[in-house]
Amino acid sequence: MYTQQELDAIDRKYFAVIVADQYDVTLMSKNTHHVWQLHNVELPDGEVTVVFHKHHASDPYHTHSRSRSLNRAIRDIKSHDQFQLNGRKPVRKR
């Protein structure tokens, strides 16, 4: 479960926060406009955040990664944005 402290720490200058509650956070990067769904799963040995991603609002989500914390997932998203903004070649659908 995400704590209020974790939710309050989300960088609102970097992200548009669409949803933020104890189990789900939906963000849109203001840099790439990619949409991210972060879902908290409670497991017997701790928690994991499953990260879903889509490039456009009209696209379906796909699984992007898993992280052990909300903070780590957000750092990974920012790293992905840097990868996108530093010249990643566009992926073309076949």
Question: Predicted segments — roles?
Answer:
Residues E6, E42, E47, Q82-Q84, ...:
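Glutamate identity and glutamate-enriched acidic tracts
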Residues M1-H33, S58-D59, P90-R94:
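Negatively charged, low-complexity tracts enriched in Asp/Glu with abundant Ser/Thr
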Residues A20-Q22, M28, L38, P44, ...:
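Compositionally biased, intrinsically disordered low-complexity segments
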